[in-house]
């Protein structure tokens, strides 16, 4: 069994102001995505300035934050937030939905593309390889917060999370680290290598949807579902898995469509 590193969720406190690691992970994810996007900017559109790229990253980040929070409210805990709407603003306590953030990003990309003469999938193909940076950082934030841990297990790398998070004090799968490895590292490598060569429009977006859906679906088998929801069906199906099914199907559909229509190869 591995010891859980006791990390204070507050990274820095200046008087009453507290800066949480969870929030810093979002900044790291956004900053890392911007740096990598700037490396590929000329391939995407040589006429774009760094300022326009910054605008794109800003609006997509807003989509992630707003969509992620609203998605969690709608998909995972609507009753609690209807009872106390101010909880929506307590983002440092966690409670973000990837699927909600993904919808927010799509809406932001659609809006930004129309204003800048770019198609929706042109932007999504450009952005998709950058997303795992934020996903990986977010999962590290979950780990530091000692939240979203896995089921009890006797594997050698099991961890006992702090009592405030897990009163049962059982050795558990560190499922946040599994998601970091799959959704952050593995997904980044797959998309970054795949998008290094010109691909048909929609192919990179399809690869993202397909592999994220597969990775998340797999990890959900060892991750404890949100207490207020539990399992949706059959004693094992979670809300996360339900939301991943359309992503997997959409990913397969986009890849098939990309390679079976008239080829229009463009750099991602």
UniProtKB/Swiss-Prot annotation:
Membrane topology: Multi-pass membrane protein
Broad class of where this protein is predominantly found: membrane
Transmembrane intervals: 10-30, 56-76, 92-112, 120-140, 174-194, 202-222, 236-256
GO BP terms, alphabetized: lipoprotein biosynthetic process
Annotated localization: Cell inner membrane
Gene Ontology cellular component list: plasma membrane
GO molecular function: phosphatidylglycerol-prolipoprotein diacylglyceryl transferase activity
EC category: transferase
Residues annotated for a 1,2-diacyl-sn-glycero-3-phospho-(1'-sn-glycerol) binding in this entry: 139
Keyword Lyase applies: no
Keywords: Cell inner membrane, Cell membrane, Membrane, Transferase, Transmembrane, Transmembrane helix
Superkingdom of origin: Bacteria
Pathway membership: Protein modification; lipoprotein biosynthesis (diacylglyceryl transfer)
EC number annotated for this UniProt entry: 2.5.1.145
Coiled-coil zones: none
PROSITE patterns: LGT
Function according to Swiss-Prot or TrEMBL: Catalyzes the transfer of the diacylglyceryl group from phosphatidylglycerol to the sulfhydryl group of the N-terminal cysteine of a prolipoprotein, the first step in the formation of mature lipoproteins.
Family: Belongs to the Lgt family.
Official protein name in the record: Phosphatidylglycerol--prolipoprotein diacylglyceryl transferase
Species name: Pseudomonas putida (strain ATCC 700007 / DSM 6899 / JCM 31910 / BCRC 17059 / LMG 24140 / F1)
Gene name, Swiss-Prot/TrEMBL: lgt
